[in-house]
Amino acid sequence: PTVISMANHAYWNLAGSDSIADHELHVPAVRKLVYDEFQIPTGITDVEGTPYDMRVSSTLGPILEATGGLDDCYLLDGVGGQLRPGAVLSHPGTGRVLRVLTDAPGMQVYSGNNLGSPFHVHQSMSLETQRMPDAPNQPALGPCVLRPGEHYATTTLLDFTTSGT
């Protein structure tokens, strides 16, 4: 047996600028993981009424200011194994839109809090569809073990458009 949770850690900045603060992010998730000081999940919380609530498209600048940066796993609603919306990242100034569809149960939203040279903090962000972090140590977070003879597959679609299309 082996633990498996493949994720794509590509970074996105739809404006090609020095900051994602003017981007908008929509994450249609009601819940996210809660972490301790070592970024180990300790539970699940609702996002309603918090800066982490992006069920309505929100400008990232105020969110980054309120949170100090995002590095959070959202629990995506919907039926496991079926494609569903994970996120929409957009840049109003250019009209560029990235839609993420996935069959994964979670999505880590990371705002580049620790980017180093030649990049800098919050210059881009990653939208990582995946299984739950630390699931091997916390079975309540869902399955993550692939046993001999089993098959693992996951699908994430990245759809690029411009506003109005």
Descriptions of predicted regions:
Residues P1-T165:
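An exposed, glycine/acidic-rich loop-and-rim segment of catalytic or binding clefts
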